[in-house]
Amino acid sequence: MSQWQDIKDFHEKFALSYDGPPRDLPTDLSSFRLGFIFEELDELIVAETKTEVLDALVDLVYVIMGTAYLQGFDFQEAWRRVHAANMAKTRGPSARSQEYDIIKPEGWTAPDLSDLAGE
């Protein structure tokens, strides 16, 4: 079973399923979801143990994927496209001057997600 299926199962269990085209969330639901994301991010910021960090990371991804699900996005295909574009990047110096930085090489193209967003 995939994480995406887990997200679908969770939302179906609580009668929150959505199986339509990509959509904007109603303002109240969007505000709730964004608040929920910030709450989980705050848990990550204040985490003091590796266990707390891991829990916060999983919760954050879970809520974000749930939000994508409720918007009707094909998250798996979007992930595939973004991953492919990221794999075309290279490691090198950037304006941030971080040794861990990954940069967009000459000719790099961002993934087109417009069809998945219904635009």
Q: Which role does the model predict for each range below?
A:
Residues 1-57, 61-119:
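Flexible "arm" and connector segments at domain edges
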